[in-house]
């Protein structure tokens, strides 16, 4: 089951998992996008879900357990990114609060709603999609970066807490050509979506599956602190105007 499965990374992973003979549930707010992602594929099922609504999450989880009891893998992929360019002045925090709700509370709530069911299934896994910006933040997107840093930390704790019962995996994307923000799908310096999805699947098919799915393009961010270059990396991705 993949949240945010109607577009971008979620859609690309759904297609590849389906093509490997998996039954896939794609979930998200926009039914039209979900239907397009399903594209008439027999084993892709569409379930609407507003990940920001706790009541909907409860109802959704109950429906998954009832109608798709063999569900054993949850991809917490839904996320939003909004820029916050002026932190030096008092501002409306609705965008920041929306990102916290979608990017952090959403995965926590949905994992909580399904954890007991997943623990009862063989081969169970929770896969959280964070971001390289959780390791070195983009100054113009501080709350987005912070939510992904928090999701990484939560994933580490969840992995330890569920060891032996549910495998917990973190996918750490670099910049990928998706519609996460307007125009991102045209950014030539970002990784092509198809290439990223293919690389992710190659990691997921390894035995054992790595705890973190790290394509080459994200290592610059993921390993910055451990390699003693956090400050220079922060400056590189956040150049100061002249």
What is each model feature region?
Residues 4-8:
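Conserved glycine-rich cofactor-binding loop
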Residues 20-36:
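Conserved glycine-rich Rossmann-like NAD(P)H-binding loop of the short-chain dehydrogenase/reductase
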Residues 48-59, 93:
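The beta1-alpha1 cofactor-binding region of Rossmann-like NAD(H)/NADP(H)-dependent oxidoreductases
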Residues 58, 81-97, 140-143:
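Conserved mid-core segment of classical short-chain dehydrogenase/reductases
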Residues 111, 147:
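Active-site helix of classical SDR
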Residues 131:
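Residue(s) in the substrate-gating loop at a strand-loop-helix junction
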Residues 170-171, 182-228:
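C-terminal helical subdomain
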